[in-house]
C-alpha cells in the first residue's frame, strides 16, 4: 500500500499530529523523514515518546527513505509520512512513490 497520508509540518510529530492526524490516517506506521532529526539521538527519542500507542515509528534520513521506497520495503505497510520540507515529498514522487493525500501546516492554518 505505501503512503496513505503525508504532512508537511516544521514541528513534525507533536500533539495534534499524534492525537488527531495519526488516527485519521489509518496508518500502521508513522515515518519521519528528516536528516537532522534522524541524526540527533535526543530529538529522535523525544519523537518516539510522542508516537501514538500501537503505531510503529521510523525516523530516517531522506536517502534512507528514498532507498527503502525504491526497494519496495513499505509496499505491505500503510505509512503516514511527516516531513519539514516539500522538496522531500517531491523527491519521493520523482521515484514513483504515490502520495494520495497531503496536509500542509502553515502556522495554525491547514491547507
At which residue positions do the language-model features occur?
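Long, hydrophobic N-terminal alpha-helical segment
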Residues: 2-51, 56
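Ordered, amphipathic secondary-structure segments that act as subunit-interaction surfaces
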Residues: 60-105
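Conserved small/polar residues in nucleotide/adenosyl-binding loops
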Residues: 109-111
Amino acid at each position: 500500500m505505501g503512503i496513505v497520508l503525508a504532512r508537511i509540518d516544521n514541528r513534525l510529530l507533536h500533539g495534534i499530529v499524534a492525537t488527531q492526524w495519526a488516527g485519521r490516517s489509518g496508518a500502521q506506521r508513522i515515518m519521519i523523514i528528516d536528516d537532522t532529526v534522524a541524526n540527533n539521538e535526543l530529538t529522535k527519542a523525544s519523537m518516539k515518546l510522542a508516537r501514538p500507542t500501537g503505531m510503529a515509528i521510523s525516523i530516517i534520513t531522506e536517502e534512507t527513505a528514498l532507498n527503502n521506497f525504491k526497494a519496495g520495503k513499505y509496499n505491505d505497510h500503510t505509512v503516514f509520512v511527516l516531513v519539514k520540507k516539500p522538496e522531500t515529498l517531491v523527491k519521493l514522487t520523482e521515484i514513483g512513490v504515490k502520495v494520495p493525500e497531503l496536509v500542509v501546516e502553515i502556522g495554525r492554518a491547514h491547507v
